[in-house]
């Protein structure tokens, strides 16, 4: 999987730092460990249609970076607060990925706290959900593709035990008829009146979740309105979800015409144990419209808390300062609060075996 940078939804540079502009972080005496991730490899970018100018990282490199941070904390014998300010809309959003499982485990180890940004997908129009019942076994929705987005992917997830097939209608009116689920097969479809090719994996049993995944990759996508028709094979009550890529992997000109702003928390923010942080405007008290929303498809309550995430002052390169907005900034603010709690618990020997789960519940109780 690939993950885009989600450190802030809005960032503004405001000039050089002067004496009157000095400011302090939440935990100014904390020591920082920063890991510069290697960009995603070219073959991964090609498969997923991600251009070279987009900040994007492989999950394996993120895991390696976290492992390095853990080794430094163990060598220094100090408590650790891990802040993850990036995410991905790939996956079933259930928190069952290898990355999520590992973070769940780390949260049970004493003296390790983890906070994750919820994502900034609340108002991007990149999630659609539909339902089936015995009287209504089809659902049709529209995808608007912008001029700038030639290569991208779409994931449709169907909860077990229901099975679905899918049809596509291009902006020129050409139809790709019923594509039934298979175990391991990728089909390629082309069109006469537009140059688009689409590659479809309709996987009946996705290996991490056991649910049905329809992975659609567009190559040289024709701009306009694409119509997608999903039909349930089984006459039972069930629900499906469709997600487009998150962050700046695609432009804001590509979106669903009837989106659902809920269930937009990016992975690993949908993990059970890490503290998932949304963002609110601390000046007005309102939730940021871009802040991703819960719950997860299995009704796990996420995000856990919201934190200040509007125009937070921050230092930047070249002795300058700026402001950042979004759930990444809110997660960083929360990481400072967790560091202060770690100081009270571990350094001052009030609760030496405190875990990430203990910290999460403490913050939820006092929020």
Q: Can you say where each PLM-predicted feature lies in the sequence?
A:
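Short acidic, glycine-rich surface-loop motifs adjacent to enzyme active sites
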Residues: 66-94, 117, 346
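Substrate-binding/charge-relay-adjacent region of secreted/lumenal peptidase catalytic domains
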Residues: 12-13, 41, 48-53, 57-81, ...
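Active-site-adjacent substrate-recognition loops and nearby beta-strands
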Residues: 90-100, 117-159, 174-183, 253-272, ...
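Structural recognition of the beta-strand scaffold that forms the well-ordered cores
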Residues: 31-35, 80-84, 113-116, 275-278, ...
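Single conserved hydrophobic/aromatic residue that forms the stacking wall/gate
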Residues: 1-11, 364-365
